[in-house]
Regions:
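Flexible "arm" and connector segments at domain edges
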Residues: 1-68, 74-193, 197-262
Length: 262
């Protein structure tokens, strides 16, 4: 990349991250708790704040989202300052790596030709001796890891031609789960359920929705509906513990009808 391009595509200037980094430096200089934190000790807070950001997005509570994004920004700034103190990196080097990556991954914007696709670009960045599935984050949840693996192998042509093939695979795996259950074989049940979930993730990938997003919304929908079921039961003096499935199923249908009409 030439000096002209570096100048053309650089986005300089102080911003929110710089202010957050300065705030964390002040905290570490003046607060014993902040001063003793390490990259490892901060991991639980980073994960918690990430989940809270996701919750606020999915709940549509944008006032809460503003606060949660601030908490997440603080955690990111904290990691940068801890690394600065250890002499391994600083905010400028973090940003420079980000900027260089985005320029590589948006060739259509920065004079590098047409965009060949995300997985193709990321494959070019991997060392030639590494396999297509190398480098996946160890902390990925199983659904996302399945999704990413299937994305990557698809980039080298190992993929169904359409979602129909994935749909048939789901049906095949479902039948195998049933066979394992009926054979009363716990080890086989575990294996076949895993295969079924893996196939369902692939179907989701080809059909459109990200499986983690789809499952998260399904969880939220179930939680909302069952909470309403419990509310109806309380209003009618019904104990959910002793009501029985028929009564609970009737309340469940009422809740779904309310949502349909409402």
């Amino acid at each position: 990349m030439t000096d002209d391009k570096d100048e053309q595509h650089h986005f300089p200037g102080p911003g929110t991250l710089d202010r957050a980094v300065r705030l964390v430096r002040f905290l570490r200089e003046n607060c014993p708790w902040d001063a003793e934190q390490t990259a490892e000790s901060l991991i639980p807070y980073l994960l918690e704040e990430t989940h809270e950001v996701v919750d606020a997005i999915q709940d549509g509570t944008f006032h809460d989202l503003e606060g949660e994004l601030g908490d997440l920004l603080l955690n990111l700034a904290f990691q940068i300052v801890v690394a600065e103190d250890a002499g391994t990196m600083d905010a400028e080097s973090v940003y420079r790596r980000l900027e260089e990556k985005m320029i590589r991954r948006h060739p259509q914007l920065f004079g590098g030709g047409e965009h060949p696709g995300w997985e193709v670009l990321k494959a070019r960045e991997r060392p030639p001796h590494e396999g297509v599935l190398s480098g996946l984050a160890k902390g990925l949840d199983p659904l996302t890891k399945s999704y990413r693996m299937q994305e990557r192998v698809a980039s080298v042509g190992f993929d169904w031609e359409s979602y129909e093939g994935a749909w048939d695979k789901v049906a095949e795996e479902l039948a195998e789960v049933r066979g394992a259950v009926e054979a009363n074989d716990p080890a086989a049940v575990e294996e076949e359920v895993g295969d079924l979930l893996f196939a369902a993730v692939n179907l989701a990938r080809l059909a459109g929705p990200h499986p983690t997003t789809a499952l998260s919304r399904a969880n939220s929908k179930f939680q909302r509906r069952f909470s309403r079921l419990e509310q109806l039961a309380r209003e009618r003096g019904i104990s959910t513990k002793s009501a029985g499935l028929e009564v609970l199923d009737g309340l469940w249908d009422e809740v779904k009808q309310e949502e349909t009409e409402g």
